Amino acid sequence: MPGIVLRSDDNFDASYRRFKKQTDRNLIVTEARARRFHETKTEKRKKFLIASRKKMLKRLYMMRRYESRL
């Protein structure tokens, strides 16, 4: 669990920023959002297929963009 030690010269904004960085690195917020609602296997499969399709289209776009420069 992330935690920060408050320094005497830190203000609230700096401390909050350090805490937020730690939680982002540990993926705590994203994991909590994922566990908030139960996902069925079908929903997981759909998300995976959408993500893979998106990756493929991105690669295709980058490849076409690269080829157009040649």
UniProtKB/Swiss-Prot annotation:
Pfam families linked to this entry: Ribosomal_S21
Keywords: Ribonucleoprotein, Ribosomal protein
InterPro entries: Ribosomal_bS21, Ribosomal_bS21_sf
Gene Ontology terms for molecular function: structural constituent of ribosome
GO cellular component terms, A-Z: ribonucleoprotein complex; ribosome
GO biological process terms held by the UniProt record: translation
Coiled coil: none
The UniProt record lists the keyword Ribonucleoprotein: yes
Family of this protein: Belongs to the bacterial ribosomal protein bS21 family.
HAMAP family, A to Z: Ribosomal_bS21
NCBIfam families per the UniProt record, alphabetical: S21p
Protein name as it appears in the record: Small ribosomal subunit protein bS21
Organism the protein comes from: Sulfurimonas denitrificans (strain ATCC 33889 / DSM 1251)
Primary gene name: rpsU
